[in-house]
Amino acid sequence: MSSSSSTTTNTTTESDSSSLPTHIGRSNSDGIIDTTPFLPPTVTRTISVDEESNPIHRSARRQGLREAARFLRHAGSRRMMREPSMLVRETAAEQLEERQSDWAYSKPVVFLDILWNLAFVAIGVAVLILSRDEKPNMPLRVWVVGYGIQCWLHMACVCVEYRRRRRRRHPEDGGGSGLTNSSSQQYVSLAQLEDRGETSNPAKHLESANTMFSFIWWIIGFYWVSAGGQTLSSDSPQLYWLCIIFLGFDVFFVVFCVALACVIGLAVCCCLPCIIAILYAVADQEGASKNDIDQMPKFRFTKTGNVEKLSGKARGIMTECGTDSPIERSLSPEDAECCICLCEYEDGVELRELPCNHHFHCTCIDKWLHINSRCPLCKFNILKNANNEV
């Protein structure tokens, strides 16, 4: 009796498992791009040829923002952000990282950096001359000289890196017609070029060594100042306060950078539309043009009045605008949400569908495509698709 009941339960479980819907086959014919904006837990992402040739060049620099976004969403939200929304924020973090890297070596920032370090060197030399009669019980003069050498090395590395980036950037910008090929890839290409040259660039190695040495040198200076105590402040006040100021500035910059990284992480995680709007306002048009964006189909979302009548319990229907034979698609509750702003589609809102079949709010995706022509979810390049159609 027990054996027959067990066989019955086995057959029922097998039939139930066979009747379960499978969630495979959600990609197009070439198996690269997902056709729905919300993906299963095992997500297949589009990997470019450049990324495959250098598989670790992005992971180290981007890991901090990605892990911060995941942690903040776990800790501060009522519900965990779904995987597609996290992918969008990881893409936005990469975009910010690439633009920050390019901005850090722009002409005004490089000029201010060199001017700032020259001021430190000049102040150090002046205090060393004025305090020639002071006799500290700790080798503070050695520490000040070492600090000045670090400033000189930093300025040299910045100048070399700035000139290297300019040499790499001018061939990209000077092509004229090359912008029509893929103008949105300017920042991506620059980031990939600099990452590829990192292993063979002496300036990068020297800058990394200088950074590590400056950290160790700061600890040594802090120890000497602390060990000297009140004797230093009375016997060598100029050298003492110079070291205190240099140490304090270093701490200030570290705290400032950490706080800025936290603010950026919070903004990317919680206020991504604001970040996109700021980049849209201040950045040059490096992505798709308005004409390229307007060529993509626009849809209007309509909420369903009676959900029970629809198989699959769809949340609403998106209907193509501006055509005599509009295409209609029903959206499930999981799909009826914008991955950028994390807001559910309201009745009558306009949606934009990309060639990869991912859809977003028009106001959200249009600004993103103005900055970067790649889909924020699967990184499909809409300009490449437009050129192939031509």
UniProtKB/Swiss-Prot annotation:
The keyword Transmembrane helix applies. The chain crosses the membrane at residues 109-129, 142-162, 212-232, 244-264, 265-285. One of its GO terms (biological process) is protein ubiquitination. Mediates E2-dependent protein ubiquitination in vitro. This is E3 ubiquitin-protein ligase At4g11680. Pathway: Protein modification; protein ubiquitination. Residues 1-19 have a biased composition (Low complexity). Keywords: Membrane, Metal-binding, Transferase, Transmembrane, Transmembrane helix, Ubl conjugation pathway, Zinc, Zinc-finger. Its EC number is 2.3.2.27. It is found in: Membrane. It catalyses: S-ubiquitinyl-[E2 ubiquitin-conjugating enzyme]-L-cysteine + [acceptor protein]-L-lysine = [E2 ubiquitin-conjugating enzyme]-L-cysteine + N(6)-ubiquitinyl-[acceptor protein]-L-lysine. It comes from the Eukaryota. The lineage of its organism: Eukaryota, Viridiplantae, Streptophyta, Embryophyta, Tracheophyta. The RING-type zinc finger domain mediates binding to an E2 ubiquitin-conjugating enzyme. Residues 1-39 are annotated as: Disordered. One of its GO terms (molecular function) is zinc ion binding. GO terms for cellular component: membrane; plant-type vacuole. It holds the Pfam family zf-RING_2.
